[in-house]
Amino acid sequence: MQIEDITIDTEEIQLDQFLKWAGVLASGGEIKALLAEHRIKRNGETESARRRKLHPGDVIEIEGMGAWRVARD
């Protein structure tokens, strides 16, 4: 699976903000649904908190959609 780097200009970003910033998902409702279905993983582990703080190097994978790495500018 190819991982796309998404650059942020802060030290950390919340999961829900990151997915919207990356253009992966448009709303918090979409994120909540995917979390409830256990389809989002952070660094290979199933994620359950939409406000989880992400840092450069973290990889987010959504089953059936792709993978994105938090990168720092």
Model-identified regions with their sequence ranges:
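A detector for short, charged/polar N-terminal pre-domain segments
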Residues: 1-13
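Low-complexity, intrinsically disordered short peptide segments enriched in small/polar/basic residues
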Residues: 3-5, 37, 59
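Generic detection of intrinsically disordered/low-complexity segments and helix-coil linkers/edges
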Residues: 12-15, 62
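A basic, amphipathic helix-loop patch mediating RNA/tRNA/ribosome contacts
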Residues: 14-56
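C-terminal structural segments of small proteins and small subunits
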Residues: 47-73
